[in-house]
Design a protein with these regions (language model features):
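Residues on the lipid-exposed face of transmembrane beta-strands in outer-membrane beta-barrel proteins
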Residues: 36-40, 86-90, 99, 131-135, ...
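Surface-exposed extracellular loop regions of Gram-negative outer-membrane beta-barrel proteins
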Residues: 1-34, 51-74, 145-166, 216-220
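C-terminal beta-signal and adjacent terminal beta-strands/loops
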Residues: 57, 148-165, 184, 191-253
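Transmembrane beta-barrel strands of outer-membrane/channel proteins
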Residues: 1, 17, 38-40, 49-53, ...
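Short loop/turn motifs that connect adjacent beta-strands in outer-membrane beta-barrel proteins
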Residues: 44, 94, 139, 194-203
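Extracellular loop and loop/strand-boundary signature of outer-membrane beta-barrel proteins
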Residues: 19-25, 33, 69-75, 83, ...
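Residues that define the transmembrane beta-barrel architecture of outer-membrane proteins
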Residues: 30-34, 41-43, 53, 78-82, ...
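Gram-negative outer-membrane beta-barrel transporters
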Residues: 52-55, 70-158
Length: 253
């Protein structure tokens, strides 16, 4: 069975660890799923649609107390996932483009967490859009892709101080905040050629640039206590890769 384990240093909700199931405190997961879809293909158009719903029971969570990691709460709950995927592609001679949209709502519910109210899954991203372009010119293949999606959920930390100025920290509602919107543009080109001296060998030379406009995306939040005696809590933004060029050479024989 899989247990969702909360991590103190991370403002998203959980890690995933594995344990053997039993008939008492670690029951076997039980789930069901419904899916419906449709597909259209004509005149170099492709349109694909799919909707789904999944319910899972007997999910386990191990939730640590924020101020004392030796204390923890063990809970069994459920998860529900529902979503829609739409894919559209068009081919025009040596150029093709495709656009996709995904809606996803994934929530957990545990009697002993979040006052028994449902809360978003750690990986829940409501809306995702991808738009890609491909073009072939002689022996060179070009591609351009744009990705956009909502920020991932995370849990806000509340700070309180007593009369002795000793700080205590607690969670607010689980995963009730979201990171900023994520988006980036990627470019690549690949050149395929053979040397005149040996036709049995094929070369592929490629150039790719990820995050072309150098978007400073926040992909997570991390918290650490400072090294001072005050034990001040520091919350840091973890950012994704900056603009990243890559060159690759492959040899086939």
């Amino acid at each position: 069975n899989q247990i969702q384990e909360s991590v103190i240093s991370n403002l998203t909700l959980e890690n995933k660890i594995w344990a053997l199931s039993n008939e008492t405190d670690l029951p076997i997961l039980n789930s069901y799923q419904y899916t419906i879809g449709a597909n259209y293909s004509k005149n170099k158009w492709i349109i694909d649609f799919e909707a789904y719903f999944k319910k899972t029971k007997n999910i386990n969570t191990l939730d640590f107390d924020f101020n004392n990691t030796s204390l923890y709460n063990y809970s069994i709950g459920t998860s529900s996932i529902q979503g829609v995927d739409i894919f559209i592609k068009k081919q025009l001679n040596k150029y093709s483009t495709w656009l996709s949209y995904s809606f996803n709502s994934a929530k957990y519910r545990f009697d002993d967490l979040n006052d028994g109210n449902p809360f978003p899954s750690n990986v829940n991203i409501d809306h995702t859009v991808k738009w890609s372009h491909f073009y072939k010119w002689k022996k060179i293949d070009f591609s351009l892709g744009w990705l956009w999606h909502n920020g991932k959920p995370y849990t806000k930390i509340n700070t309180t101080s007593d009369e002795n100025e000793i700080s205590e920290y607690s969670y607010s509602n689980l995963n009730n905040e979201k990171l900023k919107v994520y988006h980036r543009l990627d470019f690549s080109m690949v050149y395929n050629f053979r040397p005149h001296t040996n036709k049995t060998i094929k070369y592929r030379l490629g150039l790719s640039i990820m995050n072309l406009y150098n978007r400073k995306n926040i992909i997570n939040k991390d918290l650490r206590f400072s090294n001072t005696n005050s034990e001040e809590l520091k919350i840091n933004d973890i950012r994704g890769a900056k603009i990243s060029p890559n060159i690759v050479l492959r040899v086939f024989w």
